[in-house]
Amino acid sequence: MSQYTEKEPSVMDQESSKAAWPKPAGGYQTITGRRYGRRHAYVSFKPCMTRHERSLGRAGDDYEVLELDDVPKENTSGSSSLDQVHPALPNEPTVEKSETEISTCGPALNQSTESSPSIATVCHSEEVRETLESNTNLHNRTETEHTPAVCNVSSVQNGIMLVHTDSYDPDSKHDENGSLQLGAEAVEGGRHQKGLGRAVFELENGEAEIYADLSPSVPSLNGEISEAFEELDSAPLEKSSTADAELVHQNGQEFQRSSEDGVVRKRRQDDTDQGRQTENSTEDADCAPGHVEQNTSDRANHHGSSPEQVVRPKVRKVISSSQVDQEIGFNRHEAKQRSVQRWREALEVEECSSDDPIIKCDDYDGDHDCMFLTPTYSRVTQRETERNRVTSENGATASGRQESRDNAFWNACGEYYQLFDKDEDSSECSDGEWSASLPHRFSGTEKDQSSSDDSWETLPGKDENDPELQSDSSGPEEENQELSLQEGEQTSLEEGEIPWLQYNEVNESSSDEGNEPANEFAQPEAFMLDGNNNLEDDSSVSEDLDVDWSLFDGFADGLGVAEAISYVDPQFLTYMALEERLAQAMETALAHLESLAVDVEVANPPASKESIDGLPETLVLEDHTAIGQEQCCPICCSEYIKDDIATELPCHHFFHKPCVSIWLQKSGTCPVCRRHFPPAVIDASAAASSDPDPDASPANDNAEEAP
């Protein structure tokens, strides 16, 4: 038998030279199939002389067709996931392996054992029939004993064998008796999964079929499926603890395996039978070269590097209808990520995933239809319910994963809000521009809220719900989430929100006018007080700032102060309020002073009517020489005109006769100097005025006497 040596490029630390079986003339053809919803998967290998046989299989099943090319060709491609190794059967009696053991048999291998209650049906690869009988108990946990493997092998021509495996014990790796085991190893992300069980060997028509039924060992490890699988060394042999010797002969020679204590035990917990144990009888057979390759329904992951040779077939990915539906859902979700509500719903959908953050499952009657984010295809069976049970060793791992998921959630929330705030900051106007619009009576035309040029800033009346949970996922989903946040979200006004108001000077203002905030808002410097503390308009300032005073006319039009001036500078509002308070205080003070002055003046007795009438009167001339330098009346502030009658008080102050008469009737003082108008003076003047009468009377008498 010819042998050749190769070195796998993908495994750096493994053996540098490995033996391989010769490749048949027609090459090897591998057909794998899977009937979804069941626990069994199958793979068949056979030498093929023509490539037309690759289409074998029953309609309605999903097949993955692989063609194993020769080793040197595969080694030239570093990116290929198919690393094929054909090791030859060694001449050594035994080859020890840590986890798996399998015996390679030739044309005449006869094995007789006590069979387990559940024995699957084996059929030809042309008909591709599947195992119909399976154990439905989902609670087989932490058992270290194994059901003896059932082997029934008939003589065939080409030395190919058929293997059936059905594993129910996830912890059977720790079997102390070294049972006959069949497993698969793959390295990815520091995870591993074990598949062990009974095997049925049958050699028919040069075909080898492997029916693998592997259950996940740990719930947290079941969700991660490797895209490349590692195949066991071809026909590795391992001694049990009490096995005597195993001899392997090549090219038609015989090898005998004698094992007195080769007892393999396994306990299967069924609903009807528990603790059933069987023993394998000794096996004597003539064996010829055989080639066994293994493909399992669930690709196992092993933590750490393995020194054994591995084969990683390039597998065409089978895309199920559920995955297509999920991808369509992602596309639809990506198209609607402008809405905050859509984003929140997407996070809620992601929260509905199972305990393992890698898997998103939709439950339906019977099985679980699951989509794996990394890798993108797999199927989880009913045994997924066992994932709720974990061992103490894996409990720490689960808690660590929970912490990592929590940390990832809070980190994602922080990134979300950071991006959300960034979008809000970018949407706000700079340099004092106001980012919301007035009601339509001010803005004129209704703005399109969906326009990218418009920005809205609202006072929320009710809080928005935070994203409840974000699953720890990788790949394109996170990219889609980041893109959706960076796009910016245009939110419309909802019920309970109060819009900020923005006044436009002209309803149909152009874009360049809208960019000048100084033209749109009243400035505090435009309002000034005159000498009498009256609010006046400085025309120069008003023209420079182009203030529209008509805005303040809307106060009485039902707009309300809060609505009409909500855009005005708060300092200006404070200034206006202070000015109003000051005006009110001035009015109050003046009224109080007037009341005090009236009281003082009332204290002085008014002048008598006789004294008032006795005041001297002077006719005002054109040159005002009669009244001196006085130009106007101090009481009425009116200028003296020609022919006005002026009255002079004893203090030599001139007044209009009507004005001073009214004043003296209220207070007997001078309105200018507050000097009392003395009644004595009035009496004296009256007496002086009355003295000429007696003088006149004698004169009159003398006149009368003269005739």
Swiss-Prot record:
Native source species: Mus musculus (Mouse)
Biased composition (Polar residues): 74-83, 109-119, 293-308, 391-401, 482-491
Role noted for this protein: Has E2-dependent E3 ubiquitin-protein ligase activity. Responsible for ubiquitination of cAMP-dependent protein kinase type I and type II-alpha/beta regulatory subunits and for targeting them for proteasomal degradation. Essential for PKA-mediated long-term memory processes. Through the ubiquitination of MFHAS1, positively regulates the TLR2 signaling pathway that leads to the activation of the downstream p38 and JNK MAP kinases and promotes the polarization of macrophages toward the pro-inflammatory M1 phenotype. Plays a role in ciliogenesis by ubiquitinating OFD1.
Gene Ontology terms for molecular function: protein kinase A catalytic subunit binding; protein kinase A regulatory subunit binding; ubiquitin protein ligase activity; zinc ion binding
Modified positions (Phosphoserine) in chain numbering: S306, S320, S339, S430
Membrane topology of the entry: Peripheral membrane protein
Region (Interaction with PRKAR1A, PRKAR2A and PRKAR2B): 530-707
Biased composition (Basic and acidic residues): 1-10, 257-276, 381-390
Biased composition (Low complexity): 685-701
One GO-annotated biological process of the protein: positive regulation of toll-like receptor 2 signaling pathway
Region feature (Mediates interaction with TBC1D31): 549-569
SUPFAM superfamilies hit by this protein: RING/U-box (SSF57850)
Mapped zinc finger ranges (RING-type): 633-674
Pfam families tied to this protein: zf-RING_2
Protein's UniProt name: E3 ubiquitin-protein ligase Praja-2
Keyword Transferase among record annotations: yes
Any one annotated GO CC term: Golgi membrane
